[in-house]
Design a protein with these regions (language model features):
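N-terminal, cleavable Sec-dependent signal peptides of secreted/periplasmic/extracellular proteins
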Residues: 1-167
Length: 168
């Protein structure tokens, strides 16, 4: 009789989720995270992000159900997050940043969404398209031309938007 393979799940881990899907060198990014324990599920933690030469970049803490976020500007060197959980220190590598690309950032302000598309100076000056949809139905289309700027701002009124998940 074959035995089942042992679970390779670690005792404690943190997963990182850069807003917009990726980190880009030199572009400030919001990074969400989830901390989980094999035995407890989601857990509350706090920690510190360190850059090259162990320089402290930012601190972070969970907000709810093991999840939280922090703002971080990546470089060409990979950063690490250090946390203490149950009196034991853990170190996790943040995702590697791309040398060029785009970052999408969305913030909710009074009756509006503030959408920012950011790029670093080495990224191509492409014209991009931003599609906004709800339940697979297009709501809006916006062409983005950076010209010589690295940030494109698009305020979007929430009045008239349907309830539920809006996809960008």
């Amino acid at each position: 009789m074959k035995q089942r393979p042992r679970s390779k799940e670690k005792d404690f881990m943190i997963r990182f989720f850069p807003e917009g899907g990726q980190l880009v060198e030199g572009v400030p990014s919001v990074v969400a995270f989830e901390a989980t324990s094999k035995e407890e599920g989601t857990v509350g933690i706090s920690g510190t992000v360190y850059g090259p030469d162990d320089v402290e970049l930012t601190q972070f803490t969970t907000l709810h159900d093991g999840m939280g976020c922090f703002t971080y500007t990546p470089t060409d060197k990979q950063a690490k997050a250090v946390v203490t959980y149950q009196d034991k220190k853990y170190s996790f590598q943040l995702p590697k940043a791309l040398p060029h690309g785009y970052v999408l950032n969305v913030a909710s302000k009074e009756k509006a969404l503030v959408i920012k598309v950011l790029r670093n100076s080495t990224s191509l000056k492409d014209t991009l398209a931003l599609f906004i949809s709800h339940q697979g139905r297009p709501l809006m289309y916006q062409t983005i031309d950076f010209k010589d700027q690295t940030v494109y701002h698009l305020p979007l009124s929430t009045q008239g938007l349907p309830r539920g998940v809006i996809q960008l």
